[in-house]
Amino acid sequence: MKRIISKKSNRIFKPKPCFFHVEKIKYIDYKDVELVSKYINNHGKILSSKITGNCAKHQRLISNVIKRARIMALIPFISERIRK
């Protein structure tokens, strides 16, 4: 994992490890709403891998799982606050 140096403060940020590698999760289920909702912000957008720390493989899986859960109406496309 590459260390990132911030230009503004010259601090070194160590990236987060991939949650799915640490917990040794092999299958991500779209029906697991608690896990899926961790990767969505309060506006309903999918969080990037820079924020979540996921590797590219698991980030792709998470985005597909979120899209599948939205279609099955398990999670909303947008939040209630934005709809009004």
Curated annotation (Swiss-Prot):
Transmembrane segments: none
MF terms (GO), sorted A to Z: small ribosomal subunit rRNA binding; structural constituent of ribosome
Keywords associated with the record: Ribonucleoprotein, Ribosomal protein, RNA-binding, rRNA-binding
GO BP term, example: translation
Pfam families: Ribosomal_S18
A GO cellular component annotation in the UniProt record: cytosolic small ribosomal subunit
Assembly notes: Part of the 30S ribosomal subunit. Forms a tight heterodimer with protein bS6.
Protein name: Small ribosomal subunit protein bS18
Organism: Mycoplasma mobile (strain ATCC 43663 / 163K / NCTC 11711) (Mesomycoplasma mobile)
Gene: rpsR
